[in-house]
């Protein structure tokens, strides 16, 4: 592919944690950028866990809150959505906003965007097209969820790199 640097969204979840750790090992920590994009629905520990993971790995990371972007989308869609109840459409706006931000940064700085979906999610259709499924390389695309947890335990075999909260 020709890329020597990568970027990914770091959610504080197991898939992004394992993807980040593998990318840092493969490319070198200085060549992998993580972006934390909390929303009003993010838990405090997911942000702190993602931040701690990047500190443990030593890779650069950014925090870009998406609440204003999400609210702007909802505001613009209000005339179309009207009074219809909240649904998957609104939920997916968060994921697609994150995907757009990551692609913009990847394009600006010449990174490849790493997809963090695993094979279990892909097989069951659990993911958002143009959102968390965005990316030029799916590091975990051939790994079932159980294998992702096994990889996390392997990564942590000598010391805690992936915070314990992510593993439970």
List where the protein language model places each region.
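Phosphate/ATP-binding catalytic cores across multiple sugar-kinase/actin-like superfamilies
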Residues: 1-7, 101-105
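Residue-level detector of anion-binding/catalytic polar loops
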Residues: 4, 60, 112
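ATP-dependent adenylation/pyrophosphate-handling site
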Residues: 4-10, 14-51
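A glycine-rich phosphate-binding loop feature that marks nucleotide/adenosyl-phosphate handling sites
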Residues: 4-16, 69-70, 118-120, 165-168
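General beta-strand structural signal in soluble alpha/beta enzymes
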Residues: 8, 63, 114-116
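Short, glycine/charged-enriched secondary-structure capping and boundary segments
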Residues: 22-23, 48-50, 77-78, 127-131
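Active-site adenylate/phosphate-handling loop in enzymes that bind or generate adenylated species
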Residues: 27, 57, 80-160
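A conserved beta-strand->alpha-helix junction
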Residues: 31-32, 36, 44-89, 95, ...
């Amino acid at each position: 592919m020709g890329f020597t640097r990568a970027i990914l969204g770091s959610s504080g979840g197991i898939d992004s944690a394992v993807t980040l750790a593998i990318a840092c090992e493969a490319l070198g920590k200085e060549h992998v950028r993580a972006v934390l994009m909390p929303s009003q629905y993010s838990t405090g520990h997911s942000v702190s866990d993602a931040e701690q993971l990047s500190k443990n790995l030593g890779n650069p990371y950014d925090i870009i809150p998406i609440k204003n972007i999400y609210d702007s989308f909802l505001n613009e869609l209000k005339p179309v959505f009207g009074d219809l109840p909240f649904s998957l459409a609104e939920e997916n706006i968060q994921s697609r906003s994150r995907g757009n931000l990551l692609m913009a940064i990847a394009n600006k700085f010449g990174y490849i965007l790493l997809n963090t979906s695993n094979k279990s999610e892909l097989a069951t259709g659990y993911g958002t097209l143009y959102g968390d499924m965005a990316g030029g390389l799916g590091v975990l695309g051939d790994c079932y969820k159980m294998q992702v947890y096994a990889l996390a335990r392997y990564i942590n075999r000598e010391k805690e790199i992936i915070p314990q909260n992510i593993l439970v």
